[in-house]
Amino acid sequence: MQGTVAGYSLRYWLTLITGLLECLLFAGLVFGHASLVFVLKKEEYFGWLCVDTNSTMDSKDCSGQDEQFSLVFTVASFLNNFLTLLNGYIFDHCGTRMTRLLAIALFSGGTLLVALSSPEFSHLLYPALSLLAVGGVLLLITNMQVGNLFPAHRSTIITFYNGAFDSSSAVLLIVKILYEQGISLHTSFIFLTVCSSIHVARTFLLMPKTHIPYTLPENYTYGTNCGKGNTDTVEETEIKECPPTQESPETENTSLAPEVQSFGSCVKSRFFIFHLVWLSIMQLRHYFFIGTLNSMLNRLADGDSNLVSQYTNAFAITQLCGILCAPWNGLIMDRHKKKPLAPGEADLRSSYLSLLLTALQCLLFSVCTSIAFLPLQYFTFVLQVLNRSFLYGGNAAFLSIAFPACHFGKLYGLVMAVSAGVSVLQYPLVSVVREYPFYVDIGLIFLTLLAFIHPTNVFIHCRKQARLRKEHPETRARL
């Protein structure tokens, strides 16, 4: 029996570590946009949009080229979020294996299209980066459930995976460095396409066919076993629909038989609406920054390509720190786990500090971005990766805390899909920022202030629930 338990533990750890590597090396490639654009400009993708200026023969106006690259990223980031609603539905209803096979097909198609693209077929970048984005986020969605294998550290693992997702953008820095050493863009992306075979093997060996339940049954196992096992039997016991577990964290109903929230009531709750505003505003700030980073660096460096390359490398290197920053947020959200609090209360009490810190980071990041001083951008890069790690890790962790687990895929998909509509605003802002960069930055700073509504609401709710428990101690077990 001891050997069996050790076998389960080993499989859990292998799943955790390989999932972390998968998110770190593949899932968030599309967010290495700045490094990729540097290479694509050298290859003269959309080069026909650069026109000679009247001042000197050697000077060219490439604003049209910059707009095309920004639009490629806008479309990819929009689909990355918007289709997450459909992806969440597929994950909830079709299970892990089918969802991962779809993700691998999309991701492989994206890397293959980049490998087959050329300056003459620059528009292949639109479907290529879109497929990379959608396939990558699907891989992330299927991996976040791994936190259920380690209940005491669930939020930490979820944020850790999201941090790895952010850090994977640095892979395109490696592609950029290899390109400068003589290895072509096409060779690098063919290699990434071949690596998809590793994802297929992990899908069958180290991931469940359906879902990893929360809470975890005793001796739970999954994947392909070498010999007769009870994997199928164990997985058939997983919850197929929402059980009557607990009410909404916002509810004050003292009924003796509380029922789980419906999906509709989750969507209509203040928690969800304010969380959507919180995510949408800060995501727009980050997408706009990434999409315009190359043109901003060119403007601040007065067109010095060596300086632009230096700062692009610095930005990509800081993205590697995402995997180190994200667990801090998870530790904040898990810090009350061992305290004698009511179910769900510990998580909510921890979450408002995480939400507040994330909004504060974004505000400081927006202020630094608005200052037209090139050396300051090193600090801006650090703030950006820290805030982005907190943002996406905190988003997934809060949804898993505040709402029933059986709605996680749909709610995660919905919040990402709606926020995608807001992120489309980055494209018209690109046209405005060329003429009025300072005013756009100031507007985004004031917009960021709206993100503070969400942590304030959660804090007030927790204080209210604490007061109710003091007045009615008999309701503690039901809150």
Show the residue positions of the predicted features.
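Conserved MFS/SLC helix-loop-helix module at the cytosolic interface between two early adjacent transmembrane helices
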Residues: F82-H123
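Long, low-complexity inter-transmembrane loops of multi-pass membrane transporters
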Residues: M207-I273, V277, F288, T292, ...
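C-terminal transmembrane helical hairpin of 12-TM major facilitator-type secondary transporters
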Residues: M333, P340-N395
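Extracytoplasmic gate region of multi-pass secondary transporters
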Residues: L29-L40, F263-A326, Y392-A396
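Hydrophobic core of transmembrane alpha-helices in multi-pass small-molecule transporters
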Residues: S122-L139, L376-F390
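Central cavity-lining transmembrane alpha-helices of secondary-active solute carriers
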Residues: S70-Y89, N313-L331
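Glycine-rich segments within core transmembrane alpha-helices of 12-TM secondary carriers
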Residues: L132, L139, N148-T203, F315-P327, ...
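Cytosolic juxtamembrane N-terminal segment immediately preceding the first transmembrane helix
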Residues: M1-K42, F46-D66, E247-E250, T254-F274
